Amino acid sequence: MKKNNQESLSVIGHAIVSSNFCIADSQGNMPEELKSEVDWKMFQSDLDNSDLVILGRKSFEKYQSSKRFRLVATASLSSFLKQEEIIFFNPNDISIKQILTTLDLCPKKIAIAGGRLVYELVFKDLFYTEFHLSIKTNFIMPNGVPVLNRVENITQFIQRMRENNMIQSQELVLDKDTIQLRFVRV
């Protein structure tokens, strides 16, 4: 990875949510109804064009075969463990910034693939330059896992973005049941 300073770092969050802003069902699984082929292709393209992907353990376990350079948040170890293209880390022991500094990693583009704890961690430890939020307008997940703490609707999501110096910049229609809202840092 090339050296860079924080001003040129791009950190893009990606999430697809139900109309009540959940990313998973009550068991922590992503139901088929939450998927959008157009969103998936856009998401995969952005991950492919990123220097580093940050994700949680559940997402990693589901998509282990990826050849992308990944930083995986997990509570199952102390500090961090580097293995070729994967770095496992315990966010209770070491921050994202500390890992990047300790391992002399200087990505220009970081993609955030979730889940909720990872999204929150980036707000706490780093920052977002963009957030791409896809919404399945025809699907509700009662008792699901919210995308962010204390966010159950668009008003609360927009407020959370504003609190972190982000505003909505674009709205795209991905398919008949899915829109994507893009937020940028101001």
Identify what each model region corresponds to:
Residues M1-V186:
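Enzymes that bind and transform nitrogen-containing heteroaromatic metabolites
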